[in-house]
Curated annotation (Swiss-Prot):
Protein source organism: Mytilus galloprovincialis (Mediterranean mussel)
Compartments reported by the entry: Secreted; Target cell membrane
Major subcellular site: secreted
Record key words, sorted: Antibiotic, Antimicrobial, Defensin, Disulfide bond, Immunity, Innate immunity, Lipid-binding, Membrane, Secreted, Signal, Target cell membrane, Target membrane
Signal peptide segment: 1-16
General function of this protein: Shows antibacterial activity against numerous Gram-positive bacteria. It selectively inhibits peptidoglycan biosynthesis through complex formation with the cell wall precursor lipid II (1:1 molar ratio) thus inhibiting cell wall synthesis.
Protein's name according to its UniProt entry: Defensin gallicin
Expression by tissue: Expressed in hemolymph, gills, digestive gland, foot, adductor muscles and mantle.
A GO term for molecular function: lipid binding
Lineage, top ranks: Eukaryota, Metazoa, Spiralia, Lophotrochozoa, Mollusca
GO biological process: defense response to bacterium; innate immune response
GO cellular component: extracellular region; membrane; other organism cell membrane
């Protein structure tokens, strides 16, 4: 199930739910997606606030700034 974010980007609602649990939630979500590099949650004031990205560690600056 995909939804449109405020930025007009399709975001998996499960990723959004995991993000609400913080870094650990994203890492778990990414693990179950078969990605073992951890995860990160989009930070405030970025275009990807409230969703998980799975191509970086939980504390990687590029991940938090959504400069992927």
């Amino acid at each position: 199930m995909w939804i449109e974010s405020d930025a007009g980007v399709a975001i998996d609602r499960h990723a959004r739910g995991a993000c609400s649990l913080g870094e650990a939630g994203c890492a778990t979500y990414c693990f179950y997606q078969g990605k073992h590099h951890g995860g990160c949650c989009g930070e405030n004031y970025t275009k990807c606030l409230g969703t998980c990205y799975c191509n970086g560690s939980g504390y990687e600056y590029r991940c938090h700034s959504c400069d992927l």
